[in-house]
Amino acid sequence: MTFAAPLEAKSIRFRARSFVAFTLTPEAPMVEWLQGLDHWIGNSPGYFAGRPVLLDLNVLKPAPSEIAALVAELGTRGIRIYAIELEGASLGPDLPPLLVGAKEATTEGLLPGRKGGQEGSGKPDGKAAEGRAPDHGTEGRADAGAAGKGKAGASKTDESGPQVSHYDSGTLMIKTPIRSGQAIMHAHGDVIVLGSVASGSEIVAAGSIHVYGTLRGRASAGALGNTAARIFCRRNEAELLSVDGWYITAEEMEGVSRGKPVQAFLDGDGLRVETLS
């Protein structure tokens, strides 16, 4: 006598998520671009550690062999490429997959792209390639991400994260200090920190960033293309300040705005850091 167990219908669950992606867009000449990248990494060690990065090659349009060499170069710098954007390309199995159908997002919704400017300290100066931070965009895919679609959220690097409050306006309020190693990524509006931000931590916000204590970590406002975003802090000891991807480092602020209450904002085609009275 045989016994047949009843079949159980099992469903496969698919969910769409939106998340903040970090995008690198290489430009020729590659030697100079890599030197600029090394300068960025030197000023912000560990910035790419553990983060998937999108490689946008629509400007460079390299051959597959050149892509492999570039991915290897980035790998030696601790940058892990999880997907490549290159219209009309066909890549082999030894390269990261092509990202198809994703759109860049801003606080106003999905857009095909956005514009950028140049950075500076006080006055706009320097080449764009030397002052451009990695782009931050939201890419829609059917897998896990840092911020879920719908309710405003923040991602942290450990379980014992800061106390946060969410508001319908999209503002994220953090009531406790942000410790070293923690990362707050808020793709729905402003971030307000009532305490201090430790060295080695990071805040990424679609809107403005307000720190009512000492800012010692990295702060990136306007991460989804909001050029009107600003960064405010009571005491500036930041490792890096960035608005809409244009940044200024600690060494560039030394002797000018370090240790003072400041605001950082885009002024024309440059990033300006001003002291507050």
Swiss-Prot record:
Subunit field text: Interacts with MinD and FtsZ.
NCBIfam families given in the database record: minC (TIGR01222)
Composition bias, Basic and acidic residues: 122-142
Keywords: Cell cycle, Cell division, Septation
Species: Mesorhizobium japonicum (strain LMG 29417 / CECT 9101 / MAFF 303099)
One Pfam family per UniProt: MinC_C
The family this protein is said to belong to: Belongs to the MinC family.
Entry protein name: Probable septum site-determining protein MinC
GO biological process entries: cell morphogenesis; division septum assembly; regulation of cell septum assembly
Stored PANTHER family: SEPTUM SITE-DETERMINING PROTEIN MINC
Region (Disordered): 107-168
Function: Cell division inhibitor that blocks the formation of polar Z ring septums. Rapidly oscillates between the poles of the cell to destabilize FtsZ filaments that have formed before they mature into polar Z rings. Prevents FtsZ polymerization.
